[in-house]
Amino acid sequence: MSKRTTYCGLVTEAFLGQEITLKGWVNNRRDLGGLIFVDLRDREGIVQVVFNPAFSEEALKIAETVRSEYVVEVQGTVTKRDPETVNPKIKTGQVEVQVTNIKVINKSETPPFSINEENVNVDENIRLKYRYLDLRRQELAQTFKMRHQITRSIRQYLDDEGFFDIETPVLTKSTPEGARDYLVPSRVHDGEFYALPQSPQLFKQLLMISGFDKYYQIVKCFRDEDLRADRQPEFTQVDIEMSFVDQEDVMQMGEEMLKKVVKEVKGVEINGAFPRMTYKEAMRRYGSDKPDTRFEMELIDVSQLGRDMDFKVFKDTVENDGEIKAIVAKGAAEQYTRKDMDALTEFVNIYGAKGLAWVKVVEDGLTGPIGRFFETENVETLLTLTGAEAGDLVMFVADKPNVVAQSLGALRVKLAKELGLIDETKLNFLWVTDWPLLEYDEDAKRYVAAHHPFTSPKEADIAKLGTAPEEAEANAYDIVLNGYELGGGSIRIHDGELQEKMFEVLGFTKEQAQEQFGFLLDAFKYGAPPHGGIALGLDRLVMLLTNRTNLRDTIAFPKTASATCLLTNAPSEVSDKQLEELSLRIRH
């Protein structure tokens, strides 16, 4: 077997006249009666190889037997294509290889679906079952090439900045961090369990107490939670922690790193600092803590209408401490029928809204179901507050503030997609800061950490932990990209007494706190430096930078929406002997 000269996708005019050896898969084969053309494929792309009896009759005979996905080795001379056969769509489109020798390395059965780019309309479950074939597609191959480039860029940046890459345990202790843990029974310790880490949070804090100063890890994390398009049970996190820093230091580091990544893998220079917005401002203007700022359509407070109008829904809402907000779809009045509006009403119902009121702005006033409730002065108020003009569609939700925010926040994104308002070429990064430290869980009747229990409150708000916990703000910051939460971080608590107070506010008894987190509280007794960090979702970053819409397309062997692996049929039953060794019994 000869040595490969180069990759198929890298054969360009620089190789003209050279005899080369290529190895790869038959992408397709065309028999033109006396001549056979084969597109040979590898991870870098496709090159056309030609079997011509003038060069080798023996090679032509073998080529007659090859089929799609055969693995072959070819030797031949690189020549320029005839002008009428040049393919400008591919990097190798100016050249072809006149084959003098071919060897079939391995045959292939007919694949369950075509690997050609033109034939990707295949049921996703079939693609996942034969994932090793799916990954041969150039589109996915390029996605994973970019994933490699992204991780390489991240590592280079962090290495240059003096960070140590340190691994943390995969088998660890189950602690209450929000999502359900994946549990691993211990054979040695009967009746006891390890947990797979939801994040290396506590270990990276312990590494700061150990004096390592700057840590990072590109690490697998596990959360047993309901899945959706941008979530997986196991995912990869870029985990970073730094000592003797404040919030500004961490945000600046994260920003510099992301700018470097985008420049190196996308060729896009991001000038200036990322925009910043407080949590309250994001919720007020966009109805979301991860707003997509690539388009306008902000939420506008029109609660004044509830005080001025004789419209019971609006009036009752304001009198019961609710609010009325509107969004304006510019020029969309004619695009949405009453049936369409009924569908949008059903959409906001999902988010708890009782209804969706709407009007269309025309030259002489308003039309629509509630248009008749608007007196002339009410119309003027609406147009002044919203800036709406003739041809615009104005939609209202009147309810509790959180319902208004969630429903209109989701609706603006839906409308933007339907109306084509989103510039898909934009990369709109945004920092969301000044988060609430705590949230109140109505079901559990207690406070829970908005991020995690180790986030420090703002110094000015520490006293509020004992008096008004719901008002305390955190030294926390999220990085958002195009409406997706890319990652989040915070300055951590580094004082044992404050950490114990935080556990108390969260409803832990001293005994429970010691049992769950005693190792951390003990570590705080031995000189903990101020520290903080951030964690970025690598899979999500790759998804956004490669313009994918599904997280599964960025993971080599992903799980389905029901957390199964169709390739290996995991999870699976295990033998009675294995269960017995673990002292486990399955109850159906």
From Swiss-Prot:
Indicate which residues the UniProt annotation says bind ATP. 223-225, 232, 485, 537-540
* CDD domains, alphabetized: AspRS_core, EcAspRS_like_N
| Stored Gene3D superfamilies | Bira Bifunctional Protein, Domain 2, GAD-like domain, Nucleic acid-binding proteins
Keywords on record: Aminoacyl-tRNA synthetase, ATP-binding, Cytoplasm, Ligase, Nucleotide-binding, Protein biosynthesis
**Binding site residues for L-aspartate:** 177, 223, 451, 492
Top enzyme class: ligase
Signal peptide annotation: none
Query: Which SUPFAM superfamilies does this entry report, sorted A to Z?
Result: Class II aaRS and biotin synthetases, GAD domain-like, Nucleic acid-binding proteins
PROSITE patterns tied to this protein: AA_TRNA_LIGASE_II
The catalytic activity of this protein is classed by the Enzyme Commission as: 6.1.1.12
GO CC, sorted alphabetically, is: cytoplasm
InterPro entries, per database record:
Aa-tRNA-synt_II, aa-tRNA-synth_II, aa-tRNA-synth_II/BPL/LPL, Asp-tRNA-ligase_1, Asp-tRNA-ligase_1_N, Asp/Asn-tRNA-synth_IIb, AspRS_core, GAD-like_sf
Instruction: State the residue spans of region: Aspartate.
Output: 201-204
Q: Which GO terms describe its molecular function?
A: aspartate-tRNA ligase activity; ATP binding; catalytic activity, acting on a protein; nucleic acid binding; transferase activity
Give GO BP annotations, semicolon-separated. Answer: aspartyl-tRNA aminoacylation
Reaction catalysed by this enzyme: tRNA(Asp) + L-aspartate + ATP = L-aspartyl-tRNA(Asp) + AMP + diphosphate
Quote the subcellular location field of this record: Cytoplasm
State how it assembles.
Answer: Homodimer.
Q: Briefly state the protein's biological role.
A: Catalyzes the attachment of L-aspartate to tRNA(Asp) in a two-step reaction: L-aspartate is first activated by ATP to form Asp-AMP and then transferred to the acceptor end of tRNA(Asp).
What NCBIfam families is this protein classified in?
Answer: aspS_bact (TIGR00459), PRK00476.1 (NF001750)
* Protein family (similarity comment): Belongs to the class-II aminoacyl-tRNA synthetase family. Type 1 subfamily.
Q: What is this protein called?
A: Aspartate--tRNA ligase
UniProt lineage: Bacteria, Bacillati, Bacillota, Bacilli, Bacillales
